[in-house]
Each structure stands twice: as structure tokens, then as C-alpha cells.
Amino acid sequence: MKIAQSALGEIQAHGAEGYPHEICGIMLGPRGEGRVTEVRRARNIIVERARDRYEIDPRDHIRIQKEADAMDYDIVGYYHSHPDHPAQASRFDTERAWPGYVYLIVSIQEGKPVDANCFVADKDGGPFNPEPLVVA
């Protein structure tokens, strides 16, 4: 997946600001291009396990989808952080995956972003396959 440096920087900053909790958001790009040029933060509605779980607030998802449509943008995928864990998909992440989207995970170690990886699923619930991350 191609992502603008500014978009990746925003994801990393969001992860650092949200530490030690998981943060989440949506990645957008010009319709049909499959590249990420902008991101939108979303609320994590899993409060009781925010340290190791996330779920995007459905109201944020709808609002961001409407915004993307108005801009003639696609939702390219979703991002979230793993506080003090590697940027690798958990079983929980994989089970909740939808095909057709890219999932970016950023590792935040002691409040600082250290790594990011992308994954795609061929069908609902995975399995996840690695997707190259190209910062351009």
C-alpha cells in the first residue's frame, strides 16, 4: 500500500498521543487509486480493554464515509496501534477483518512509534496476508 508521509506521520502521532491505549482511524485516498493521502481519527469504543482492543465508533465510520464520498475518495483501509507490542496482527484483529481493505498496525513502544506493518484479508475473518508498505 502506498501512503503519503504526512498520513503515516499523523497515524504515528495519534498512536503516541493515545498511548498506552489502542487508537484507531480510517485511511482515505482518491477514488480508485488505492493509495492513502489522508487519515481520519476515530473513537475507540472499547473502553474496558482499550489497552489491547479497539472498535471504531460506528458514528465516526458513517461520518467519515460521508466525508470521503463528498471528496470523491475511497476508504482504503483502517489503522490502529499496538501499545508495547509488535506491529503484527493479533487473532482478534484477524477475526474482525474485511476483504478489500488494508489494515495498518503501528507499534508504539513506551509512547514512541517504532514500526508499522500492513495486512489484507482475502475473506471476512482473515487470514491476514502481509501487504508491502510504501511511503511516498
Predicted regions and their residues:
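Conserved, mostly hydrophobic/aromatic
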Residues: 78
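Conserved beta-strand-loop surface patch within small alpha/beta domains used
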Residues: 1-75, 83-136
